[in-house]
C-alpha cells in the first residue's frame, strides 16, 4: 500500500483531500473532518513513477478511470522513504 499526504483537486472541484492511499488498484481519498473521516474510492487506470537524481527526487503520475490526473512529487530521505508534497491537476 502506497500512501501520499497532501492535497488533490478533482475535476468536479470538490474540497481538498488530506490523504491519498493506493491499495489494490483503488485510490482511496480521505478527508479529515471534525465529525470524522470522509472517504471516497475510485479505480485506477495507470500509475507511472519516475525517480530522478539517484533516488532523491521522485514523481508519480496516477491516471484514474474518471480521467483525473494526479501528480505526487517530492524528495526521499537517506533511507529512500518518500517525503512527498501532493499536487493535483486535470
Predicted segments with their positions:
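Acidic, Ser/Thr- and proline-rich intrinsically disordered linker/docking segments
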Residues: 1-13, 28, 38-90
